[in-house]
C-alpha cells in the first residue's frame, strides 16, 4: 500500500526542484535520505522534509506493519509549477523589468519493495 506526501507553494523555481527530485527518483528511502543529506542544493531540504512526511504517512496508514526505510522506495516523485508572483524592478531610462518569482508543488509517493534484497 502506497503513501503520498505533497508540499505546496514552495518558493523555489520548479526547474531547480526537479534537479533534486531526479536524484532520488526510484531509490530506496534510506539511500534517498543519504543523498539528500549530502546534497548542496537548497531544494534538498524541502525534498527531505516531504520524504520524511511520506514515510510517516505510510506508517500511519499501516499501523500493524513495521517497515524500515530499506523496505520502502520512492515510487514516484514529480514537481509541478505553482503560482508565479510578478514583480517589477526599476530599470534605466524610466523602464521596468519584470521579475517572476516562481513556486512549485512537490509530490512524493512511496511504496514497499516487492522483493527486498537481503544481505
Swiss-Prot record:
GO cellular component, one term: cytosolic large ribosomal subunit
SUPFAM superfamilies: Ribosomal protein L22
Pfam families: Ribosomal_L22
Alphabetical list of InterPro entries matching this protein: Ribosomal_uL22 (IPR001063), Ribosomal_uL22_bac/chlpt-type (IPR005727), Ribosomal_uL22_bac/org-type (IPR047867), Ribosomal_uL22_sf (IPR036394)
Lyase recorded as keyword: no
GO MF, any single term: rRNA binding
Superkingdom to which the source organism belongs: Bacteria
Keywords from the named record: Ribonucleoprotein, Ribosomal protein, RNA-binding, rRNA-binding
A biological-process GO annotation: translation
Family matches, as NCBIfam families: rplV_bact
Subunit note: Part of the 50S ribosomal subunit.
Family per similarity comment: Belongs to the universal ribosomal protein uL22 family.
Function: This protein binds specifically to 23S rRNA; its binding is stimulated by other ribosomal proteins, e.g. L4, L17, and L20. It is important during the early stages of 50S assembly. It makes multiple contacts with different domains of the 23S rRNA in the assembled 50S subunit and ribosome. The globular domain of the protein is located near the polypeptide exit tunnel on the outside of the subunit, while an extended beta-hairpin is found that lines the wall of the exit tunnel in the center of the 70S ribosome.
Name recorded for this polypeptide: Large ribosomal subunit protein uL22
Organism of provenance: Pelodictyon phaeoclathratiforme (strain DSM 5477 / BU-1)
Gene: rplV
Amino acid at each position: 500500500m502506497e503513501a503520498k506526501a505533497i508540499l505546496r507553494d514552495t518558493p523555489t523555481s520548479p526547474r531547480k526542484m526537479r534537479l533534486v527530485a531526479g536524484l532520488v527518483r526510484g531509490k530506496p528511502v534510506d539511500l534517498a535520505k543519504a543523498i539528500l543529506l549530502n546534497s548542496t542544493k537548497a531544494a534538498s531540504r524541502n525534498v527531505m522534509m516531504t520524504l520524511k512526511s511520506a514515510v510517516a504517512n505510510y506508517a500511519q496508514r499501516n499501523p500493524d506493519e513495521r517497515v524500515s526505510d530499506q523496505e520502502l522506495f520512492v515510487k514516484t516523485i514529480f514537481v509541478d509549477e505553482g503560482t508565479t508572483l510578478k514583480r517589477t524592478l526599476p530599470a534605466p531610462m524610466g523602464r521596468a523589468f519584470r521579475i517572476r518569482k516562481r513556486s512549485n508543488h512537490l509530490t512524493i509517493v512511496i511504496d514497499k519493495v516487492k522483493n527486498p534484497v537481503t544481505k
